[in-house]
Amino acid sequence: LDLVAGLDPQDGPLTFGHLYGEKAAAVFRELKLDEAAAPASPLVRGQFAPELELQMMTTCLTFTRPYVFPFRTKVFFYCPQCWQDYFPARVLKQLNDTSSEPPPVTQKVDGQQVSIDLHCVHHRDVSVRMLPSVPDIPVVIGVRMSLSFPVLLSAVPFQSVDFNRAVGKRGLIEVWFSDGGLASNFPIHFFDALLPTRPTFGINLTDPHPDHPDELVHRPSGNASGLTPRANVFTSVVGFLGAVYTTMHDWVDGMALPAPGFRDRIVDVRTGDGEGGLNLKMTSETIEALGTRGDQAAMELEDFDFDNHRWVRYRTAMGGLSESFAGMLAARAGYGPFIEQGYDAGYAFGSQSAR
């Protein structure tokens, strides 16, 4: 990563601050955009204008859900000693020089507030640390987390307080992060706004088409094409079970890919046996052939019509809003008393009579 970014190894690892640019990184730190007290006003947050903003998806196996990295929460800590097995010394030096120990976390025991032990679950003499402010986080941390995959690359361990335990028994647990594709293999929604101001594109790796085996790169030709998803035809019990797994894993992507406002900016690159995926022993010729298809996919997008795309997105957004507003209008009369009463953060479920 440092070599690609043009950084001298003596300058330290590539950080998110390098990508943001010096001015944007300073604004990020000043506004504390990665903290709970960050300003909510879009006008204030709009002062942060990075030259390049990188986000990655990673899957938390312990909490069985995906997360965006850099994290938007401060609940995950790392152990400097544990991470010696995962990252080189200069990456850990950057982390340790810019991070800090977490503030005390307490729980009530016998009527007294008692601090939860924040020492590593494996190294009892080492305190865990919070990740530094996002501009100071090495990019390789997110890359390593999002690329982890069972058997091939080890998952990355963090630690977090388990608040699901009973009061008095809460403490740190190990929390494992692996490949973001375990939860969503095509998170193009990462980059979307309801009404886009800039185009975003995706390349989707798929199987060859049965009727067009020689067409290795494909993009729908117009608004009326690509309306239906590819059928997953199976004729055996094994195929059925495979379809069950694929549906559980890919149903979100399956709904998005043929949707209006999505399919016009997605190019299929079709891969055969021995290409892509978990094939780690591809020949240089195979890799070059895949690279050529990637070039062709980019060329398919050269005639992308952003005006047409914005019109389609506007129509779908307005249609969705109309449907939502109609439902809100129908229910609004019954919500008046609750809205006037306001929100009670300390409200206990099941205590309606107390209100």
Locations of regions flagged by a protein language model:
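Patatin-like phospholipase
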Residues: 1-355
